[in-house]
């Protein structure tokens, strides 16, 4: 996806320090202090324009949410949605997923959402996929024993790749749907991409998984 560069995005984000965390590394191990409570922290990696993470924060005030999107020109749209949602349990961060361990302490994150991640279809780009074992190693360190990864995509190839990657990593698959919108699953909050692709008749794939610590 080609992103239109917005040279003013960084300044706009920094105008809202109550939402946008400019230096998340400063709060490693201290995110409960950022939110002012002991509620669990959930993160979405690749938040895009923020429809999902804002919707989740509004629907679940007892959970703290952090939307992570490395492109500031995209994250600024998530900022607008966060402002509109008018919630106190949402923060936004501009960082690459490879740097998550610089921002969060071991076991500090209760749940991770991966929604419509870039499929990186070329074989030479496999390591860039957010469900690649390199990233799974990072997630395993961030999540506590009961922590889960929730993954949604419209891309069948990426979903099949992820099923194999999770299984080979010895993860436990606790939920799998090959057509989410025609399943019994309740409480789904759609992303912008999800609305777009489902409107065209594409099935949405979803799974939940956790690490087998035994």
Curated annotation (Swiss-Prot):
Substrate binds at residues 122, 154, 191-194. The active site is at residue 118. Its EC number is 2.1.1.33. GO terms for molecular function: tRNA (guanine(46)-N7)-methyltransferase activity. The keyword RNA-binding does not apply. S-adenosyl-L-methionine binds at residues 44, 69, 96, 118. It catalyses: guanosine(46) in tRNA + S-adenosyl-L-methionine = N(7)-methylguanosine(46) in tRNA + S-adenosyl-L-homocysteine. Coiled coil: none annotated. Keywords: Methyltransferase, S-adenosyl-L-methionine, Transferase, tRNA processing. Pathway: tRNA modification; N(7)-methylguanine-tRNA biosynthesis. One of its GO terms (cellular component) is tRNA methyltransferase complex. Belongs to the class I-like SAM-binding methyltransferase superfamily. TrmB family. Catalyzes the formation of N(7)-methylguanine at position 46 (m7G46) in tRNA. This is tRNA (guanine-N(7)-)-methyltransferase. It comes from Listeria monocytogenes serotype 4b (strain F2365).
């Amino acid at each position: 996806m080609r992103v239109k560069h917005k040279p003013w995005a960084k300044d706009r984000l920094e105008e809202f320090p109550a939402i946008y965390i400019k230096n998340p590394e400063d709060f490693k191990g201290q995110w409960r202090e950022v939110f002012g409570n002991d509620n669990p922290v959930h993160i979405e990696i690749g938040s895009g324009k923020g429809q999902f993470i804002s919707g989740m924060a509004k629907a679940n005030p007892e959970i703290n949410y952090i939307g992570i999107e490395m492109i500031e020109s995209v994250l600024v749209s998530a900022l607008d949605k966060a402002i509109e949602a008018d919630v106190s349990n949402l923060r936004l961060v501009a960082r690459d997923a490879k740097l998550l361990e610089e921002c969060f302490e071991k076991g500090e994150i209760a749940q991770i959402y991966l929604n419509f991640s870039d499929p990186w279809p070329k074989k030479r780009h496999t390591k860039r996929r957010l469900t690649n074992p390199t990233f799974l190693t990072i997630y395993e360190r961030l999540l506590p024993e009961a922590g889960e990864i929730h993954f949604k995509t419209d891309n069948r190839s990426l979903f099949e790749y992820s099923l194999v990657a999770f299984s080979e990593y010895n993860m436990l698959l606790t939920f799998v749907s090959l057509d989410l919108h025609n399943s019994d699953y309740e409480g789904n909050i759609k992303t912008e991409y999800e609305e777009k692709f489902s409107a065209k008749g594409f099935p949405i794939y979803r799974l939940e998984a956790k690490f087998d610590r035994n």
